Amino acid sequence: MNSLTVPIGLPIEIKKSGAPDTQGLILQEFKYPFVAKKYNLFEEEKRLVWPESPEWELELIDTLNWSLEKAIKEFRNEKVNQKQKEQNLDNYHMTDYKSHLHIKEFDIISRLVLDNFCPKEHNFRTEDCWGALYRKGHYIQTHHHWPSALSWTYYLKTSPNTEPFVFVGQEKEYPIYPEEGDLIIFPSVMNHRVSVSQTDDERIVIVGNIR
């Protein structure tokens, strides 16, 4: 398949009572030129257009990766921990879903992805961006990111021993074995998962949703 028509769930209106107006749910569609795409930011580094930022002058992927890993490992927030437990996501460490709004490194990586790898004909913006750290015993159940339009996962740290990123189709599964620096972009409607890690090697990723 060379292209895919992707439904986009737009924000719904809220009634005066505070309840969502589900009848007001609007769907748009856009033609995406591929089902999933993988890049490596180390290989793409020379052609990247970096966002202007007075707080970030070093246009080096290696430096950005180091800063992102540090930010993820140092992140602590009781509200995020509680939300993870409520969503049964407490088997790994993560930052909050809006990290791009208050952590400069997340803002930089989200803008790099949006400006360099996403379709220009749509007025997309980053809706969510967060970091996650997985160790032995950690996993991700099958899920999707709709109603976002596109989603992406960027691999800060991984090894040949970590579990693959798996797209789950109706009849078969499609594993991807990422390397450090790999960026996977895909329509948010695509189901995906990661099996239970059997290694002590860390897997550290940044995840983003675009709408």
Regions found by a protein language model. Name each.
Residues 3-122, 139:
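Non-heme Fe(II)/2-oxoglutarate
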Residues 102, 106, 145, 199:
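Aromatic-acidic/polar surface patches that form glycan- and anion
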Residues 122-196, 202-205:
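Catalytic core of non-heme Fe(II) oxygenases with the double-stranded beta-helix
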